[in-house]
From Swiss-Prot:
Residue runs in coiled coils: 163-176
Annotated Gene Ontology cellular component terms: endoplasmic reticulum membrane; Golgi cisterna membrane
Domain characteristics, as noted in the entry: The cytoplasmic C-terminal domain contains a functional dilysine-retrieval motif, which is involved in the retrograde Golgi-to-ER transport of the protein.
Quaternary structure and interacting proteins, as annotated: Probably oligomerizes with other members of the EMP24/GP25L family. Associates with the COPI vesicle coat (coatomer). Associates with the COPII vesicle coat (coatomer). Interacts with ARF1 (GDP-bound).
RNA-binding keyword on record: no
Species annotation: Arabidopsis thaliana (Mouse-ear cress)
Signal peptide: 1-22
Omega-N-methylated arginine: residues carrying this PTM: R166
Keywords: Coiled coil, Endoplasmic reticulum, ER-Golgi transport, Glycoprotein, Golgi apparatus, Membrane, Methylation, Protein transport, Signal, Transmembrane, Transmembrane helix, Transport
Protein name: Transmembrane emp24 domain-containing protein p24delta8
Region listing for Interaction with ARF1, in residue ranges: 202-213
Record: glycosylation sites: N97, N174
PANTHER family: TRANSMEMBRANE EMP24 DOMAIN-CONTAINING PROTEIN
Amino acid sequence: MDLCRSSILLLIIALLSPRTLSMRYELKSSKTKCIGEEIHENAMSIGKYFIVNPNEDNHPLPDSHKIIVKVMPPQGKNLHEADKVEAGQFSFTAYENGSYVACITAIDYKPETTLTIDFDWKTGVHSKEWTNVAKKSQVDMMEYQVKTLMDTVISIHEEMYYLREREEEMQELNRSTNSKMAWLSFGSLVVCLSVAGLQFWHLKTFFEKKKLI
C-alpha cells in the first residue's frame, strides 16, 4: 500500500514539474538533429523554434540561415513540415502512444555555416498556456488556479491510465515469453532425449556387430 502511495506521489510530482524540452544548440550546414519525446494518446503538444540572429544590430538573417523542420509521429504522415524557414511553431494532439520526433536540418550552403537553433517543446498540461488565457479573458487568480489544478488532475488521470495500459502490455509480454520458454525447454528436452536414444542405439548396434555383447 505504501509503495502504491509512493508511486502516485512520484507521478504527481513528475507531472507538476515542467515537462518541457527547451534547448539551444549549434547546427552546421546540411546537418540534421532529431529530438524525440515519448507522448501518450490524446496528450496536447506544442513547440516553437527559431534561428538565433548572429547580427548584434538585428539585421535580417543571411541566406545561409534557413532550416527544414519535420515533426513525425510513431507511424503515418508528418504532423508538421516547414521548408527553408527562419522560425516557426507546431501543435498537435497525439493520436497514439509512442515516440514523436522533431528533426531540424540546416540547408546545404557553401561555405559551411554554423547556425544556433533555439527549440522549445511542451507536452501535456504544460502545453496549455493558462497564463495567456488568464490575461486575455481577465479571469481572477482563483479561477486561473482552479483551471490549472483541474487540468493537472486530468493529466494525472490520463498518465495513470497510460501507465496501467503499459503494465498490462508488459504482463502479457511476460506471459507470452514464459510460455515460449516453457515450450522451448520442453523441445530441448525432447531433442536431448532423442539424441541420447540414438547414441545408445548406435552403440548397441556397434557392439552387437563386433559381438561384444
